[in-house]
Structures are given as structure tokens and as C-alpha cells.
Amino acid sequence: MTEQILFRNVMKITEGSLEPFREAVRQAIEFVERNGPQIMVRTFIDEQEMRAVSFQLYRNCEDVLRHWEISDPHIRAVSKHCSVEKFEVYGNPSDEVAAGLSQFLSGGRGQIMNPLAGFTRF
């Protein structure tokens, strides 16, 4: 059974990198809107606290892997201007997806929340 996967990524923007971060995020989102498999991507910013939060909703784990495959240059461009403070996964990631996220899930920065109940309506 394939289940939706939702990511919530809290990022601390590097001092002096607000504008480059904003531009890298805009370019990344424009790219995935045209080419990516995500159902939804939304990024929010708190300029005073120099933090951003990104939500990404995928149909399944295969779409997560596809996103990583085609979007790596954009992911790297955004990552040059921030660090991940917290990464939450909502759903049941495959072993391959969990392995790809392991750097964010260790050290108390991340967690996986298993589904209990719900639905999606678009």
C-alpha cells in the first residue's frame, strides 16, 4: 500500500544570507512546480527570527525519491544558506527514504510520526 508522506522542515537561515536564501527557495519551488512530483509545497519565513518552515506533501515514497533525484542541485543551493533545525516526517517512509533522511533524524533533530487516521481532499 502506498501512503502519502508529509515533510515539515524547520530551517535556520545563515546570518547575512536572507536574500540568497529567499532566491534559492523561489527557484527551487519554481522548478518543482514545473517538474517535481510533490502534491504540495509551501514555505513560510520569519525574517525577524531568520527561520523558515517548508511543508512538502508526496503521494508516496517513490515520489520522494524522484524529487531527490531531479532536484538535488536546487536542494544544495538552498542548503548553502541555512541549516536544518528540525525535520519531521508524517507517514511511513520506506527504508530507502528513511536512510536518505537519517542525517536529519539523528541527534534529536527529527522524528517520524506514524499515521493514525485521516484523509486528503483536493
Q: Residues of each region from the PLM?
A:
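Short S/T/G/P-rich N-terminal loop/turn motif that feeds into the first structured element of a domain
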Residues: M1-A52, R59-I70, K80-F122
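A short, acidic, amphipathic alpha-helical segment used as a generic capping/interface helix at domain edges
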Residues: D72-R76
